[in-house]
Amino acid sequence: MAAKDVYFSSDARDKMLRGVNILANAVKVTLGPKGRNVVIEKSFGAPRTTKDGVSVAKEIELADKFENLGAQMIREVASKTNDKAGDGTTTATVLAQAIVQEGLKSVAAGMNPMDLKRGIDKAVAIAIEDIKTSSKKVTTNAEIAQVGTISANGDKEVGEMIAKAMDKVGNEGVITVEEAKTAETELDVVEGMQFDRGYLSPYFITNADKMEVQLEEPLILLFEKKLSSLQPLLPVLEAVVQSGRPLLIIAEDVEGEALATLVVNKLRGGLRVAAVKAPGFGDRRKAMLEDIAILTGAQVVSEDIGIKLENVSLEMLGRAKKVSITKDDTTIVDGVGEKADIEARIAQIKRQIEDTTSDYDKEKLQERLAKLAGGVAVIRVGGSTEVEVKEKKDRVDDALNATRAAADEGIVPGGGTALLKASKALAGVVGDNDDQTAGIAIVRRALQAPIRQIAENAGVEGSIVVGKILENDNSAFGFNAQTEQYVDLVVDGVIDPAKVVRTALQNAASVAGLLITTEAAIVEAPKKGGGAPAGGGMPGGMGDMDF
């Protein structure tokens, strides 16, 4: 086992705090409408320019291992927030840094770290309740566009495009963001269905760059049982080969000999084919296969209705314009099913939603409804250079996640105002002892950090902005950093999703609490000797062994 270096108490915390500050200072310059860009070196290709907090955080790895521990814990705040809410990563990082800095000062002054953490947790719970109470449901398309615009750093075109996409496919529909081949950013809405089953073998892949199977104008075979031998299917497979079209097989499973035979045929080029498992389980799987059948004009091959595999003909296969399959998802675009049949099926599912008493069943039925009634919207992001396209794509991804979050939990005034107003709810709150009360005060001060940073990035003194907003009792009154005016933020369209603000605060407090209560840090000790120069010394990188 390799030797370890160990630091204790304030030595460990000070080292980790340095790492926290390095990462947070690099991330927080991107906050707000006047946030700056960060340029990241890439091992190959052009450098990347971004204003996306989590992209900056992911690139930072420090040479000092103790400092790196602190940096990686704060990086965790950004990625957790990104995973849950899809946006708000920079806000979360700024909050975490503020809580850690204040918390470690209090620990150094002799306060009990565990009581401080209890105080912090209590304050965060109150602040989150305040954010939830002040949130307002998103009702209009214009509000969705505003949320998207703010998250895309004031890019109105992106905000409106996302609102249009959500209007077309609904909040439940599938919206993907791709890089365009042109300089224009455009929205493409295609009716289609996506389900969470990927290809059964990577040998089916047709696009190695994207690791995807792409089938144009495929025929689709739906089989509700396991497929373990292709013998009964040979007549229809020969007919498919003669038709010159690719084949998608959706079955409970395709195993053993059947899968091997399909793969061999695909590799030899005799049959363009892919196989995926049917979505869902039990009765729900049957229902979803039926949905796919209606969408693609297919007949489900099922012994329940007396159809055997050997009797399958080309007429029983479904058809679609295109099918894309990744390792996790399958998307069927433009099925040829009759519109009247699809509408009847949608009406039937809606009735089932009304009749069911189980929340779980209701949720699953709504998922099916979204898949049938929704569609696939593709936002193609264009730009003059590759660097510009990648930077814009980051912003569109953020904006899309933010609008989804807004549809989930509503909106609050943006620009850090909701957090600042939540600090008012902590006035007069005390803990069970002085140290807990100090923990509450830490959160109260930390809630000012995002708005201070937004103001400072805009070249305005943060303390003055904080003072002015706290004096005003209107919950929507705040500072619009874009225009540098004090306005009603909701009227001005400066709004944030409540879910993003809540998630940022929860994750920041969670990781900051862990850092404050750290009493020892352990890392691997550096190896002796600097190792042999590249290409020289002992083979296989053995030059740094201590013989």
Curated annotation (Swiss-Prot):
InterPro entries found in the cross-reference section: Chaperonin_Cpn60_CS, Cpn60/GroEL, Cpn60/GroEL/TCP-1, GroEL-like_apical_dom_sf, GROEL-like_equatorial_sf, TCP-1-like_intermed_sf
EC number(s) from the headed UniProt entry: 5.6.1.7
GO BP field: protein refolding
Enzyme class: isomerase
Region (Disordered), start-end ranges: 528-547
Induction: By heat shock.
Signal peptide residues on this chain, from the entry's feature table: none
Family: Belongs to the chaperonin (HSP60) family.
Subunit details: Forms a cylinder of 14 subunits composed of two heptameric rings stacked back-to-back. Interacts with the co-chaperonin GroES.
Name of the protein in its database record: Chaperonin GroEL
